[in-house]
């Protein structure tokens, strides 16, 4: 009996190790293009201090391991918690309880989102806690909207149209310093912490309904929840002063490798405390449900607890790696390229980085498979990958163009969203839901970390306004799947219709010829 128990533990350990290795490999594939391009730039175009480059590499290693641990932990804890709470709420069946819990969960999960933590720490002149609270409340409110939409079967397309009309009306009157931050907030909230949790919760709630549209209506939650932060930060702009976007690059230098080690060791306790506070609400909600509703056995509870621990450790490593290693080199590299003879490289380099970042993003493979399944194989995954790569490269190039020229982000977002919403009338609802849900796929951790810092470095070196020029890159990237996925859907739908018409026409001719022969 003892040997059997030992064998089970060993098998579980091996399975966990295999999964962790796979998650770390996926993280490495995401980060590797950035490391390679930065290495080439530092070796041949803009030499950097060796200690700064070493700090960047150590930070990259921490990001890879941190993202791997976080992904495994979120899969083993947050996704399961979301699914169980969704199922439990359907059994309770009381609308006020469902809406209250949905709001609380929206706030709790959002404030622990790693990409949002990075963005909030990067924004100058705006208190981090205030920004996190505003974004959390925005997501919480729209979680309530999502639940109502699922329960009452309201068409996603019209909800999106109404919400984006409200967004751009507010954007027309708010402080322009808040535009980029607001739209970036919408992009970073649909990250690796929030998305699995929200999707699992939505699927659980959709089981309340038994009609054919229930499963399809479980899509679109991420799309709507990303609108909440945009509206809440735009509203924040009416009551807060952006401070003119003044910022400067903090010169980071280390005398030796000992100094590098000290910097990371000093950062770790800070992020341990921050993430403990950030994860406390979601852990508290889970414990309340465990005591009064779930009542899981010790083994099941232990698995989720270990998953939460993985998530916590992963977040701490990720944030320390980003803020100590990635950020400083990204900003200095951008500033160095923005001055002198290398200035012409900025836009093509941004496009190149965009192409490789999305090509290496593991979540894109999941998206490709999802669209292939929904289209019954009519839309090949390769078409989605190429369209996304081109779209994100274009988004990065346009974002850099904004930094260089100071063009308002609204000149890109208003027509972009107008076209995206227009396309939604020409594709099946499920394509629209998947496209709007997929903004977070494109705006992955590398966009919110390295690329934002890179753009900020360029803006500061050119004497620009960081808030109006550099911020908005995540929003530009997050908008592209809305356009590319729906556009591919329209193209393939037209092809299918033409093929069906040709087949029908061919069949008609066949029948006529047969009758003529018989005569």
Q: Where would I find each of the regions flagged by the language model?
A:
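Transmembrane helix-loop junctions in multi-pass membrane proteins
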Residues: 40-54, 74-82, 108-123, 142-153, ...
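Structural signature of hydrophobic alpha-helical transmembrane segments
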Residues: 56-68, 125-137, 184-198, 250-251, ...
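Helix-loop-helix junctions within the multi-pass membrane cores of secondary transporters/permeases
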Residues: 87, 95-166, 343-424
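Transmembrane helical segments that form the transport core of multi-pass membrane transport proteins
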Residues: 53-58, 250-363
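Hydrophobic core segments of alpha-helical transmembrane domains in multi-pass membrane transport
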Residues: 30-45, 59-69, 101-108, 138-149, ...
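Intrinsically disordered, low-complexity non-transmembrane regions of multi-pass membrane transporters
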Residues: 1-27, 31, 82-96, 210-214, ...
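Flexible loop linkers connecting adjacent transmembrane helices
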Residues: 75-93, 118-124, 326-341, 363-379, ...
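Juxtamembrane and boundary regions of transmembrane helices in multi-pass small-molecule transporters
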Residues: 1-5, 146-161, 177, 181, ...
């Amino acid at each position: 009996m003892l040997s059997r128990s030992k064998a089970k533990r060993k098998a579980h350990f091996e399975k966990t190790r295999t999964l962790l290795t796979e998650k770390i490999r996926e993280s490495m594939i995401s980060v590797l293009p950035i490391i390679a391009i930065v290495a080439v730039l530092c070796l041949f175009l803009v030499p950097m201090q060796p200690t700064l480059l070493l700090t960047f590499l150590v930070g990259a290693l921490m990001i890879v391991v941190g993202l791997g641990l976080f992904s495994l932990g979120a899969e083993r804890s947050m996704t399961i918690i979301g699914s169980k709470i969704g199922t439990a709420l359907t059994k309770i069946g009381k609308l006020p309880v469902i809406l209250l819990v949905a709001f609380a969960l929206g706030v709790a999960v959002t404030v622990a989102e790693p990409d949002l933590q990075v963005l909030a720490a990067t924004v100058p002149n705006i208190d981090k806690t205030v920004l996190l609270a505003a974004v959390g409340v925005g997501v919480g409110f729209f979680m309530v909207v999502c639940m109502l939409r699922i329960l009452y079967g309201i068409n996603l397309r019209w909800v999106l149209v109404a919400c984006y009309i409200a967004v751009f009306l507010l954007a027309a009157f708010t402080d322009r310093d808040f535009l980029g931050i607001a739209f970036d907030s919408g992009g970073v909230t649909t990250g690796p912490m929030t998305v699995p949790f929200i999707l699992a919760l939505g699927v659980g709630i959709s089981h309340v309904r038994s009609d054919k549209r229930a499963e399809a209506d479980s899509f679109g939650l991420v799309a709507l929840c990303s609108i909440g932060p945009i509206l809440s930060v735009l509203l924040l702009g009416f009551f807060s002063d952006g401070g003119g976007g003044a910022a400067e690059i903090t010169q980071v230098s280390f005398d030796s490798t000992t100094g590098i080690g000290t910097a990371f060791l000093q950062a770790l306790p800070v992020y341990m405390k921050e993430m403990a506070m950030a994860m406390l609400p979601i852990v508290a909600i889970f414990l309340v449900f465990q005591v009064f509703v779930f009542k899981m056995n010790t083994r099941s509870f232990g698995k989720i607890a270990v998953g939460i621990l993985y998530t916590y450790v992963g977040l701490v490593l990720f944030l320390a790696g980003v803020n100590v290693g990635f950020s400083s080199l990204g900003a200095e590299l951008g500033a160095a390229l923005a001055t002198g003879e290398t200035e012409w490289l900025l836009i093509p380099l941004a496009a190149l980085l965009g192409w490789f970042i999305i090509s290496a993003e593991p979540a894109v493979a999941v998206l490709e498979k999802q669209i292939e399944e929904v289209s019954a194989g009519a839309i090949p995954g390769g078409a989605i990958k190429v369209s996304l790569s081109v779209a994100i490269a274009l988004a990065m190039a346009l974002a850099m163009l904004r930094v260089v020229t100071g063009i308002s982000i609204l000149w890109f977002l208003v027509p972009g969203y107008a076209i995206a919403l227009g396309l939604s009338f020409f594709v099946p609802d499920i394509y629209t839901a998947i496209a709007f849900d997929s903004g977070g796929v494109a705006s992955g951790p590398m966009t919110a970390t390295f690329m934002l810092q890179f753009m900020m470095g360029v803006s500061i070196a050119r004497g620009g306004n960081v808030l109006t020029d550099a911020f908005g890159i995540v929003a530009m990237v997050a908008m592209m799947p809305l356009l590319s996925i729906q556009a591919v859907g329209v193209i393939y739908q037209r092809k299918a219709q033409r093929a069906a018409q040709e087949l029908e026409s061919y069949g008609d001719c066949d029948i006529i010829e047969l009758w003529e022969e018989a005569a």
